Amino acid sequence: MAKHLANSIVLGTALATAIAAPGCAIGTIIGGMAESYRESSTQTIQAEYTGLNGQSFAVLVNADRTTHADFPNLAPVLTTRISDRLYQHTGATGWVPPESLLAWLYDNPRWVSTPAPELAKELGVDQLVVIDLFEFRLNEPGNRYVWDGRAAGTLSVVGGLGETPTFVREIDVSFPDSDGFGPNELSAEQVASVLMARFVDRSSWLFYDHEEPYYPDY
């Protein structure tokens, strides 16, 4: 509320200035007002996939062994956060809670090679949201002095009756947003935390209407 009030005050002041300005300057002032407003405001982005509405689902996150070894909490964190977000915002009527899902996956390590219809039946859901991580790094190989984090993967939605995905998107986020940051400025935990948060946002936002800055950082 305070943010919108502040934006309104700035906009009102700029309008008063525009009214008092010569005709040729009004266009420039109005353009600057609009740009200033965008820089401090958000816009509504529509969902790209609404098929979880009225359905039950489970989120499955897969990564290679090296990634699992380097970041053992990565898959559980992504599974939990994305599952929670989708259940809260998509209108889904059922889900497999993250704690139960992670326990089931631990007890059934061959799930990665199990056909989607069989997996959906085992989990008792209508749809599977499958995330295959193909990269999660904090820096370029061989350069541990400069952070250059990246989290990337493929998100697919597969219905319980078939193996062909009904929705597929590539997710690719990075951090930091500028060069020159190393362990003296940011810890490895901070870089990993921001990467995971951004990946969760970009994965989850595909499924429901949400607000984003006009000029997002990721």
What positions do the PLM features span?
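N-terminal segment of the mature soluble domain
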Residues: 53-134, 160-168, 194-211
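Extracytoplasmic/secreted cell-surface and envelope-processing proteins
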Residues: 69, 138-143
